[in-house]
Amino acid sequence: MALPDFSMRQLLEAGCHFGHQTHRWNPKMKDFIFGERSNIHIIDLSQTVPLLHQALVKVRETAAKGGRVLFVGTKRQAQDPLAQAAGRCAQYYMNQRWLGGTLTNWRTISNSIARLRELEGMFENEGGMAGLTKKEQLMLTREREKLDRSLGGIKDMGGTPDLMFVIDTNKEGIAIQEAKKLGIPVIAVVDTNCDPDLVDFPIPGNDDASRAISLYCDLIADAVLDGMGDSQLAMGMDLGEAEAPVETLVEAEAEVVAEAAPAAEEAPAAEAEAAATDTSSESDKTEA
């Protein structure tokens, strides 16, 4: 199976080339900057394309070996596309506040996940709440909701991930530090105010615009699905004869590709530029 296809035109239309104001740049991003316009740095997408391709290759290789991929992005505009992409490719995500020790103190996190499962079982079992007062039930409901917000995306991970994909390295600095401490490779979108040396596979690009974030997440998810397909083929399995979960993944990939193609052609570049410019003007793409 082939890697997900993408073009520089798609990156342009999504506004991936818009950086931050020139005075807020990180000098380490100098080699990835094409120039500036209206005091906004413009990212060199001719470098983004090959680096994004390298990242997708790494994702596919990891998925083909049965590895776990963790999507991380807690800023508001990344939360929904991140969760949707991770769910579509049967991987894991954290889109709320990163809990310190999520990776380096996995045993404690596992205990919290066990508690979440216990609460879910109580609510699913008709007699699980028997004998509890309304106040006690309300407290348990709130506890379950809080745990689900924080850990729902990783409750089925079963251990630390083999690869981590990050949106906004500045905001997710703790997550990156934990991954590096454990030797977990990190793929990340690096904007003009980021340090590309902190990650193993930097992808120069806008990490604030919603359309850009959705594009990155979808490409990573498609690469995971490709890797899963390669794994099935390597085992000599006919995908047409595979079990329902694999069929669901392949069908989901086909649907997303079919929907994304016409959308990319119809979306005017001017709209993407305006959206990205608006994002930059809001306190210069304030880091959430």
Curated annotation (Swiss-Prot):
It comes from the Bacteria. GO terms for biological process: translation. Residues 259-276 have a biased composition (Low complexity). Residues 259-288 are annotated as: Disordered. Keywords: Ribonucleoprotein, Ribosomal protein. One of its GO terms (molecular function) is structural constituent of ribosome. GO terms for cellular component: cytosolic small ribosomal subunit. InterPro entries: Ribosomal_uS2, Ribosomal_uS2_bac/mit/plastid, Ribosomal_uS2_CS, Ribosomal_uS2_flav_dom_sf. NCBIfam families: rpsB_bact. HAMAP family: Ribosomal_uS2_B. Belongs to the universal ribosomal protein uS2 family. This is Small ribosomal subunit protein uS2. It comes from Maricaulis maris (strain MCS10) (Caulobacter maris). The gene is rpsB.
